[in-house]
Amino acid sequence: MQDKYSPSEVEQQAQQHWQAQDAYRVTEHARAADGSDKPKFYACSMLPYPSGKLHMGHVRNYTINDVMMRQLRMKGYNVLMPMGWDAFGMPAENAALNNGVAPAAWTYDNIAYMKKQMQSMGLAIDWSREVATCSPDYYKWNQWLFLKMLEKGIAYRKTGTVNWDPIDQTVLANEQVIDGRGWRSGAVVEKREIPMYYLRITDYAQELLSDLDPLGWPERVKLMQQNWIGKSEGVRFAFPHGIPGDDGKVIGDGKLYVFTTRADTIMGVTFCAVAAEHPIAAHAAQGNPALAAFIDECKHGSVMEADMATMEKKGMPTGLTVTHPLTGEAVPVWVGNYVLMTYGDGAVMGVPAHDERDFAFANKYGLAIKQVIDVKGQPFGTEAWQEWYADKERGVLVHSGKYDGLDYRQAVDAVAADLAAQGLGEKKTTWRLRDWGISRQRYWGTPIPLIHCDSCGVVPVPEQDLPVRLPEDLVPDGSGNPLAKDARFLECTCPSCGKPARRETDTMDTFIDSCWYYMRYTCPDGATMVDGRNDYWMPMDQYIGGIEHAILHLLYARFWTKVMRDLGLVKFDEPFTKLLTQGMVLNETYYREDAAGKKQWINPADVDVQTDDRGRPIGATLKADGQPVVIGGVEKMSKSKNNGIDPQALIDQYGADTARLFTMFAAPPEQQLEWSDAGVEGASRFLRRAWNFGVAHAESIRAGHGNGVVNGATDADRALRRELHTVLKQANYDYERLQYNTVVSAAMKMLNALEGAKDAGADARREGLGILLRVLYPVVPHITHVLWQELGYAGAYGGLLDAPWPQVDEGALVQSEIELVLQVNGKVRGSIVVPADADRAAIEAIAAKDEAVHRFAEGKPPKKIIVVPGRLVNVVA
């Protein structure tokens, strides 16, 4: 055993041992020593995109997973920790454009490097289950399930709006549109309607909402999904009109439909707004060039809800009116840039007095504002919006004719009944959730398995011809989809009539790939999409990933699971029983501004920081030139802020165990972790201390493995065992709560106790170090494995990987004596030691005889002795 701790040598030794044993290969129905089935536990981190290198967020995520699985394996569970690659997507195409290399080659090179990095971290991954979503063996089943959904009517085709770059002749993702222009060409982006494929996720809206309740997920994530699904109960009703369309017939059968959750405010309607694509807008624009130009401007705007919420609300009158269904009054119709044709009926009612958006719109354009809700004691005015204007809990109706005096619920019921009686409306439940458009006009993704035939129309690819393989040697040039120009892929034969035909060139949304990869881990070599092994492992016991995936990925995965259930492929309703969303990793930022005032971000490694006598930063300079830089504050590690830490450099300098220890100790898993170079140094020092303690006591520990453990022959033994088992009990509790930062804290207390127990015997010390190594092992597996082997524990207990988790000895926790604070006349004057089972009289007698009592009571006999059990004695003299 080497005297000095060398992380690289220790970690190489441990990893070679695990590799030789194939230590992490897992099978179903593993048996315990007594022949019984081990309970299964499946925990999985969200699979990474193979961007090229791991970042510290990856390190934290996977270490959390690894700690959990190693500890549960020691507790007798059959654990599964797999890994794969979310390998399709736009970044690979962008890299291909920049570097002139095929996305496939770029992706596979990145996978190889990142896999090597993960292995250097010592992660207990079963690599035999590795999955890459760009593999035909994987995406074949994306295609197969799509065809099944097409058969069932869950998948369907309709036109959808996309961002079109007229110069590059390609569709752009929303994030590729910057200030209304294409990110590469700079061209003004157009909106185009093209045929696309959709999945009916809305058919599952109520189930997706209801099934959130029992999940062991953070309430914040549940709320985000609830809001995204967006169940609204209200009234859908019509404003009658006689506006004709191009064919001379009345548009929409003479009814402009809207939906509202505030039917109680219907008497306050002073305008209606329609989407730019609405037939009424198109009709009004025919003789109105200004309106036509405004509509064209709206069509070039974003269709993202987030953008709609923050952009300036604009409108223009159509000169047309519709009829209020209850008053018969004429209501002007406007075109509004904030109204989406894809949401509801493409029209909204405007009630400026009781909707903040409508209030601002009406004030901007001089529209009428009519109060119809009143809250007692609150004056109404049109100059500035007040929160109570929208209060449906305290408000009652005014200026509303027969509805005056009704509260919210009464008014909604009455209005809905009157509208229904006229055949103009009814109560309805609507959903914010929209069907999932999965068509992407991109190359690097799962090909949609359809064929276009001039004679037969759209024809599904026969099941036996799956997968439709994506050519992996194409290099995008930025002008359109490469698949549409590749004859090898495009040209085919119609499976129905045998005539020449063309393949569909759209590929699937990459969220499809991440919908079910965790099930493929259970049966990666399966001849079917999933098999009986999936029934064993699923549903997953613990899912781990970032809060940024709280909505789309998790929602789509839940939907996909329910579709698979309905197709008879799985037997469960929800894929993830518990969810842990780990906090972001933060670091300081530094920058200088260039001549144009643009910030040039500088990596923290290139900066010297000056601090005051309390360690607080007071300035910073660039190492290269010694000149000042601006301290920008603490932010999430990112490429854009250039404040990332390279995990590989950290591992090369300090070792993987130090990286793991710091990321677990610095903060609870669900909270943000602020990077600290001093914290990394501290983690490294702690591991050196643990190693040095093992070296110092190696001989006595190796010699004592045949001895049994007793409750200690001396007071020092008993004190050490009491401390260790007390801390072990707390560590067990913290492991169960996934509070790994306090687990590390417990291990530090154990080492402190061992180092401080100079008078303890070898047996107590041997037992104590054995407990410490097992408690610490899930966090820092390399150093603990080598110490376990070198100090002879493996011979006594077996390898650390499957060593039994240490049991708390309740007998060791029992104290024969306790220390009580001693007060004289209410002031602390020392302490006394009494038997743990001493009664009040015995404690009083011991206190009365104490020398401190005699000294501070000046020889006076006690008038009264107050005993607070387990805490203190107060002698009143």
From Swiss-Prot:
Catalytic activity, reaction form: tRNA(Leu) + L-leucine + ATP = L-leucyl-tRNA(Leu) + AMP + diphosphate
Binding site for ATP: K639
Compartment list: Cytoplasm
Motif placement: 'KMSKS' region: 636-640
One GO cellular component term: cytosol
Keywords for this protein: Aminoacyl-tRNA synthetase, ATP-binding, Cytoplasm, Ligase, Nucleotide-binding, Protein biosynthesis
EC annotation from Swiss-Prot or TrEMBL: 6.1.1.4
Molecular function terms, GO-annotated: aminoacyl-tRNA deacylase activity; ATP binding; leucine-tRNA ligase activity
SUPFAM superfamilies according to UniProt: Anticodon-binding domain of a subclass of class I aminoacyl-tRNA synthetases, Nucleotidylyl transferase, ValRS/IleRS/LeuRS editing domain
GO biological process terms held by the UniProt record: leucyl-tRNA aminoacylation
Chain ranges for the short sequence motif 'HIGH' region as given in the UniProt record: 48-58
PANTHER family membership: LEUCINE--TRNA LIGASE, MITOCHONDRIAL, LEUCYL-TRNA SYNTHETASE
Similarity section: Belongs to the class-I aminoacyl-tRNA synthetase family.
Full protein name: Leucine--tRNA ligase
Organism in which the protein naturally occurs: Ralstonia nicotianae (strain ATCC BAA-1114 / GMI1000) (Ralstonia solanacearum)
Lineage of producing organism: Bacteria, Pseudomonadati, Pseudomonadota, Betaproteobacteria, Burkholderiales
